[in-house]
Amino acid sequence: GFIGYGAVFEADGVVVDNYSVRSNNGQAMFWTNPSVNAQVNALAGYDLVILQYGLNIMQTGVHNYTNYARQIEKMVVYVQQCFPTAAVLVLGVSDRSVKTDTGFEPMDAIPYMLDYQRGAAENTGAAFWPTCDAMRSLGGMEQFVANGWAGKDYTHINYAGGRRVAWSLVDAI
């Protein structure tokens, strides 16, 4: 039978396709068919593929993400094979805070995860952008929550927060 991945109704200009699967660590992309991806790429002509994973994998006190970095490298290579004319950008994890006796503070795993993500991007020739740094330049997760730009879980930004981060990314590009 027919399996549809989307429909195209856009005019010329910048078009963003979001292939989002909640609570996905990136492994779902390997379930996609490379030949179908190549056909989609032939029709859409992607210039850039952005990968953003890792936020829910981090744990307080965990500083070694070697195995995860290998998975990131596999994901980047897979995307490069499916979309050979597109650049690949790995977004580093966003800011995330944890509750302490004195309030909320940034999760200690963030700099370690960022280092592993940055290394995986470098090892595969992908670009890297640290989302966390952009959020912290806007006040960090505590300010995002206070402004209503993130959930009270101090982990996930919402549409309003995403808009601010997106403009930071546009400025960086």
Name each region found by the language model.
Residues 22, 46-52, 80-84, 121, ...:
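Short C-terminal domain-edge/linker segments immediately following a structured domain
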Residues 34, 95-173:
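Catalytic His-Asp segment of secreted/periplasmic serine-dependent ester chemistry enzymes
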